[in-house]
Amino acid sequence: KGNDNQLFTDLDVTMETGQVVGILGASGSGKTTLTEILLGQLKPTCQQFRILENGKPVTAGSRSWSYVPQQNLLREYLKVSETFDFYADHHLKGSGKLTKKHRIAGIMDDLGLTEFANKKISELSGGQKRRVSIGIELLSPSPYFILDEPSSGLDALSDRNLLRTLKILAKSANKSIVVITHNTEN
């Protein structure tokens, strides 16, 4: 970003559908830059940069990625259930009410959010808000997810549970999940 530092040399990542892949690095190591390239928000400056999907080259940003940023972008005045309903209307356009309801219930249950359905976002802990942010993006039909520091605000047990849940969701829903983190614990 704005300088001539080479962040990566011969970066080669292979990811299968239903898999969770971690990108681990210290602050300033290029994790955000790589994320912006994958999302198509930044053009790579290297001579050769390719993303292959099913063995065929695709343009960065041309695929449908869901992205959960590190910062909380939730509407604090809404209840958890209202938040999921709001995003389901966007992510699940064309789906019937029953389909939306079942999808929301399944994700909320998987992420341990069912008991907080009637609480306002402003009443949740940081870790609970994080799970809501992840859950609403999991509503998306996108096969690709980037989660930026998903364990931010979570205690060690919640972090392990979240990663286990992400692995299960990746397999059961055929999602490819990229976890961006500096956390070497998990």
What annotation goes with each model-predicted range?
Residues 99-116:
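Conserved ABC ATPase "signature" region
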Residues 4-19, 47-49:
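Conserved beta-strand
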Residues 39:
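Helix-to-loop junction immediately C-terminal to a conserved catalytic motif
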Residues 24-26:
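The feature captures the beta-strand-to-loop junction immediately N-terminal to the Walker
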Residues 137-138:
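ABC ATPase C-loop
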Residues 120-124:
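Conserved ABC ATPase signature
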Residues 71, 76-93, 103:
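Q-loop/switch helix immediately C-terminal to the Walker
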Residues 145-149:
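Catalytic Walker B motif of ABC-type/P-loop ATPase nucleotide-binding domains
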